[in-house]
A protein has these predicted regions:
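Long, acidic (Asp/Glu-rich), low-complexity accessory segments flanking structured domains
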Residues: 212-230
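Short glycine/proline-enriched turns and hinge-like loops at secondary-structure junctions
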Residues: 66-67, 135-137, 161-165
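Alpha-helical interface subdomain recognition
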Residues: 1-81, 106, 115, 119, ...
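Flexible, small-/acidic-enriched active-site or ligand-binding loops
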Residues: 187-216
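A short core secondary-structure module
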Residues: 149, 155-192
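Active-site-adjacent elements of ketosynthase-type condensing enzymes
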Residues: 131-142
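A short, Trp-centered hydrophobic/proline-enriched beta-strand micro-motif
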Residues: 119-127
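N-terminal glycine-rich flavin-associated loop
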Residues: 84-107, 133
């Protein structure tokens, strides 16, 4: 990590800890990143590392009093640089459980968060549907309250960790009240999982069908009709960590291309001494350093108050993922045919960079939100 983004000693120690985990992941990274399923060795390494504890408050087995976005960013930057499957699995453990952390009942928290911290169970956030992607208000899954119970019906699509998760946080429309969130254990009768269309994503995906799923009303997370609140808080904390993962991926691509440009001789000199190549690498370094600075500043703000500073998490995610795509593309260009060798580090970077501009807020949707915020602030 660049010295332009100074970290407190505790975060430096965490980074060193993660580097030891990364060393264990490196030998299996190519295999894990090429799989669309859950890689058991990656899960075992993460469980043993204790890193999942960063996703849960100390009261339920976590490492710190609250989930710390800066710590999550430190981990994701390092993991993504080596194994995107590990990065995804780590991030999803927090994304799927954070609604319980901040809005769950004491009983929900006690039942599930210690298992999240240990990695005994995986978590999943079930938002998207065949007709509802970025526009969550178009969700059609229904929640009908019947006395002391609630019945869920609907279909969720492209759900990360589907089929492996121990529970799902499901967003559903509760009549005229609006969207509510519910905690649905994976073994609940009426919940079934089917494989999704295979995507260029290094983690398990599936479609979740809820057919006459009956739960106690105590399965609701937070207040009725206010299910978007914990979801938005989840985005506020974890969106900035996508930026950190993008920075980590861009840094690795830059390192690979720079090593190649130093040693590859053409026209009697190393590529690095050819003006056009030098310019590509210089621009890439500027992209990496500037987005890293923005990312960690946004993470610090998210640590103070995630919802109050959501626009900065969004800015960081937009800037870093777009920059990552530019950097990786330049680095492949610098490396020529060697950057296209299947399963080489640069070719994997090329595959892994593209989805980051779509998940956890497509760039276009984020731009729209940022523009609205800007318009509201400028009189």
């Amino acid at each position: 990590m660049s010295t332009l983004s100074p970290l407190a000693p505790a975060y430096l120690a965490l980074r060193n800890e993660v580097e030891r985990v990364v060393a264990k992941l490196a030998p299996i990274a190519v295999e894990a990143d090429s799989s669309s399923g859950l890689h058991p060795d990656v899960l075992a390494i993460l469980r043993e590392s204790g890193l999942f504890r960063l996703m849960v408050p100390a009261a339920h087995g976590g490492r710190s009093e609250t989930v710390d976005p800066v710590a999550v960013c430190v981990v994701r930057e390092s993991l993504m640089g080596v194994c995107s499957a590990a990065d995804s699995l780590f991030a999803l453990q927090g994304i799927g459980s954070f609604a319980i952390t901040i809005a769950g009942t004491p009983e929900q928290q006690a039942a599930w968060l210690p298992k999240v911290a240990s990695g005994e169970v995986l978590s999943a956030l079930a938002l998207t549907e065949p007709v509802a992607g970025s526009d969550l208000r178009s969700i059609t899954t229904t929640a009908e309250v019947e006395g002391s119970q609630v019945r869920l019906d609907g279909r969720k699509s492209f759900i990360s960790n589907a089929g492996a998760a121990g529970f799902y946080v499901v967003l559903a429309k509760e009549g005229e009240l609006g969207l509510s969130a519910f905690l649905v254990p994976a073994d609940t009768p009426g919940l079934t999982v089917e494989p999704s269309v295979e995507l260029g994503a290094p983690h398990l995906l599936g479609d979740v069908t809820l057919e006459n799923v009956v739960l106690p009303i105590s399965a609701r997370i937070g207040e009725a009709g206010k299910g978007l609140e914990p979801v938005l808080s989840t985005l506020a904390v974890f969106r900035v960590s996508v930026a950190a993962a993008a920075v980590g991926l861009a840094q690795v691509a830059l390192d690979e291309a720079t090593r190649h440009a130093r040693t590859r001789v053409q026209f009697g000199r190393p590529l690095l001494r050819l003006g056009p190549v030098a310019g590509l690498l210089a621009d890439s370094w500027a992209d990496v350093e500037s987005t890293r600075l923005l990312t960690y500043r946004a993470a610090e703000l998210a640590r103070e108050d995630p919802r109050a500073h959501l626009e900065y998490s969004s800015l960081a995610k937009l800037a870093a993922t777009e920059a990552c795509s530019r950097v990786v593309d330049r680095c492949v260009q610098v490396s020529g045919r060697w950057g296209l060798v299947r399963d080489s580090r640069l070719e994997r970077c090329h595959r892994q960079a593209r989805p980051m501009r779509i998940y956890e807020g497509a760039s276009e949707v984020i731009r729209l939100g940022i523009a609205r915020q800007l318009a509201a602030e400028v009189n």
